[in-house]
């Protein structure tokens, strides 16, 4: 099993966000999971132009940056940990840009059978909305959400233990291929919604339509 940590703090390895995420990775590694870390600040991530190139030709994009490589790593992972500081009750701009650029993942539910977890830090402690948003993104891509952990910039041993436990839980979910009934209901509703859209736009988005047919979803 392998997990990809995508961290969007501009402070990278020195950030509270990454330090907290590191405890999640420690829990994962103790269970034998191979972990890789990407700091978004090391990559060029442009804003989505809504050109629809990724819908017409899978994983293609008119923008020339590093996003396609990141998306391929996401596809190759069994689980993904999204870690972000709280920027006005939202993920950072770079993380949001990455989410927007993965629109094809949403259309074609490309994180189906994968697992997502969230890590958030802030100065205010008002992090629930950000974790909820990470969970929402995971569900729109058809992933199971194993949970999240959040903390103030200065956190203690209890919070570290919570993050470590989350890593263990993520590893267990992946190993057991755990399905959460309430989440599956949300995912199924999303599939029904996009099934209608994909059929409606099948002439414009031929490769996405073909993907759905090959999956047996249409």
Predicted feature locations:
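N-terminal beta1-alpha1-beta2 submodule of the flavodoxin-like/Rossmannoid cofactor-binding fold
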Residues: 1-104, 144, 161-218
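Short histidine/acidic/glycine/proline-rich micro-motifs that form metal-
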Residues: 10-12, 87-88, 121-125, 152-156
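Short beta->alpha junction loops
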Residues: 39-42, 149-154
């Amino acid at each position: 099993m392998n997990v990809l940590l995508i961290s969007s703090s501009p402070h990278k390895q020195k950030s509270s966000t990454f330090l907290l995420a590191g405890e999640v990775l420690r829990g994962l590694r103790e269970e034998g999971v191979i972990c890789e870390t990407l700091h978004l600040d090391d990559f060029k991530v442009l804003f989505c132009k809504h050109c629809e190139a990724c819908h017409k030709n899978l994983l293609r994009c008119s923008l020339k940056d590093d996003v396609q490589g990141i998306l391929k790593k996401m596809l190759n992972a069994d689980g993904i940990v999204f870690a972000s500081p709280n920027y006005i009750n939202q993920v950072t701009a770079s993380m949001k840009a990455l989410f927007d650029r993965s629109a094809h993942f949403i259309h074609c539910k490309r994180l189906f059978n994968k697992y997502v977890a969230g890590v958030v830090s802030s100065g205010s402690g008002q992090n629930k909305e950000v974790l909820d948003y990470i969970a929402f993104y995971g569900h729109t891509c058809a992933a199971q959400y194993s949970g999240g952990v959040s903390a103030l910039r200065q956190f203690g041993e209890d919070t570290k233990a919570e993050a470590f436990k989350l890593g263990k839980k993520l590893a267990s979910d992946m190993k057991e291929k755990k399905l959460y009934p309430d989440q599956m209901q949300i995912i199924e509703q999303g599939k029904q919604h996009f099934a209608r859209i994909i059929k409606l736009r099948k002439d414009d988005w031929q490769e996405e339509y073909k993907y759905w047919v090959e999956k047996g979803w249409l």
